[in-house]
């Protein structure tokens, strides 16, 4: 019974970032949501960025060879990362505001609707996601570069 529970938790935490990524794609397909709630989309991008950042920070820490990590410890670390991400999601770190400001500047310059801007952004995010799946540090650096082009 307990192994099934831990397997469920482990699988659930591994695909958390994929779920957030898929939510972004679903929002792209839902035109009403993307037109009226661009701030919600930027909050989801901020949430995804925070989750990637926290998990990569944990991976970069030194691990002692004498202290082996058990499966339950990795589950706990993933759950802790999710909790910290959810805590920062409520308050935010200001990235969503920056994205909204960049979208407004871009929108004013190009006279585009929120849907057109989100299409351009999500297409960049999709190509970014499919091309870079192995290197964690490059993922964070390229994600930050992606925000410059909004």
UniProtKB/Swiss-Prot annotation:
Any Gene Ontology biological process: bacterial-type flagellum organization
Q: Which family does it belong to?
A: Belongs to the FlgJ family.
The protein's UniProt keywords, in alphabetical order, are: Bacterial flagellum biogenesis
This one is known as: Putative flagellar protein FlgJ homolog
**Other known facts:** This protein is shorter than other FlgJ proteins and lacks the muramidase domain. It may be degenerating and may no longer be functional.
Q: Does the keyword Manganese apply?
A: no
Recorded source organism is Buchnera aphidicola subsp. Baizongia pistaciae (strain Bp)
The protein's matches in Pfam families, at most eight in alphabetical order, are given as:
Rod-binding
Indicate the transmembrane segments per the record: none
């Amino acid at each position: 019974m307990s192994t099934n529970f831990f397997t469920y938790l482990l699988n659930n935490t591994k695909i958390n970032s994929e779920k957030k990524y898929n939510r972004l794609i679903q929002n792209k397909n839902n035109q009403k949501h993307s037109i009226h709630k661009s701030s919600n989309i930027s909050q989801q991008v901020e949430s995804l960025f925070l989750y990637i950042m926290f998990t990569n920070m944990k991976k970069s820490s030194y691990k002692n060879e004498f202290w082996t990590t058990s499966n339950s410890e990795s589950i706990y670390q993933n759950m802790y990362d999710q909790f910290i991400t959810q805590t920062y999601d409520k308050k935010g770190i200001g990235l969503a505001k920056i994205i909204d400001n960049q979208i407004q500047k871009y929108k004013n310059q190009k006279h585009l609707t929120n849907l057109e801007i989100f299409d351009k952004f999500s297409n960049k995010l999709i190509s970014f996601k499919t091309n870079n799946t192995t290197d964690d540090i490059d993922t964070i650096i390229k994600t930050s570069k992606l925000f410059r082009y909004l």
